[in-house]
Design a protein with these regions (language model features):
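C-terminal membrane-associated helical module and adjoining short loops/tails
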Residues: 6-11, 24-182
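A mobile, often basic/glycine-rich helix-loop segment
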Residues: 17-19
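Catalytic beta-strand/loop signature of glycosyltransferases that borders the donor
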Residues: 14
Length: 182
């Protein structure tokens, strides 16, 4: 990424913050381009998810290098597998809480309705599945292939997407019917 510099790669946590902030910046520019107002909770969730994926990738890098008994990346020197597992557990917890807070926020209630909370179990199970793939199955080296190649993740995401879009469609339908009746 263009913000990742040699110096940032030497400071491990700074490197992760810069990497994950790139995803948030793209989200913000996309929202500006599409003229969509984003909830602060969605921005926070996106940043936390990006950070979680970056930590999982670094965990995989460290695990692969530990078998070679050499650390080629300076940024990996400040990490251990245990530390990265703890960070990912913390990030997963905070991400889930952020999504739950989004689901019950006035922004979500006013724009989408209270049905968003019904999507939360699929978010929780998806995050738990990600942690399982990274920590147990040791598949964090290529996050995109890992997530797109895992049938359980695809099913969970599909159910979440169908449920979320159905909630929005029902809100639009109910609003349209209400407008025509009045």
């Amino acid at each position: 990424m263009w913000l990742e510099t040699r110096r940032a790669n030497r400071v491990n946590r700074l490197e992760l913050a810069i990497l994950s902030s790139g995803f948030v910046i793209r989200l913000l520019f996309g929202a500006i381009e599409m003229k969509i107002e984003l909830s602060p909770w969605i921005i926070l969730c996106s940043g936390l998810l990006a950070l979680m994926i970056a930590v999982g990738k670094r965990r995989s890098d460290l695990e692969q290098l530990s078998t070679q008994n050499s650390v080629t990346r300076r940024s990996l020197r400040g990490y251990s597998l245990e530390f990265l597992d703890q960070v990912n557990t913390l990030l997963a917890s905070v991400t889930i809480m952020s999504y739950l807070l989004f689901s019950t926020s006035t922004y979500a209630l006013n724009s989408i309705g209270n049905g968003v909370l019904w999507t939360a179990p699929f978010v929780i199970f998806s995050i738990l599945r990600y942690l399982q793939l990274v920590s147990v199955n040791k598949q964090g080296d290529d996050p995109t292939s890992m997530l797109l190649g895992d049938n359980i993740t695809i099913i969970l995401f599909s159910i979440w997407l169908i449920l979320f879009t159905s909630i929005i469609a029902l809100i639009i339908l109910a609003t349209t019917i209400f407008v025509f009746k009045n």
